Amino acid sequence: AFAAENEETLVGFCVLGGIFSEGIDLKNDRLIGAVVVGTGLPMVCNERELFRGFFDERNNHGFDYAYLYNGMNKVQQAAGRVIRTMEDRGAILLLDERFLQRQYTELFPREWYPHEVVDIRRMQELLQAFWNEGNKGK
């Protein structure tokens, strides 16, 4: 259960598009990172396929309008929980190879640049260096 005044390490899990990924405001060091697993693409359904077909006929971007933009909006909302004020500091990890595709990277907010693609060992090194740098003045 979530405790408002938790003094210990807390790991929270949420679903993209759920209330935690969109409606919680944890400032300062209350939330120091987000690990986003998957691209947030909505399920295929008749309504979305009609929407996709409509935009494919108009501009050949039906997948983008029906699925991609919706999914990336969820990803950005979840990642946005980490940085709420100018004083906040945190790490955002995107775990899905599809995030390497241009159609996804073009939708990254400017604050996500520069970003780096790493393996698990390099990720551990970078996160340690990131937190060591942030704790120098404390």
What is the meaning of each model-derived region?
Residues 1-138:
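ASCE RecA-like P-loop NTPase motor cores
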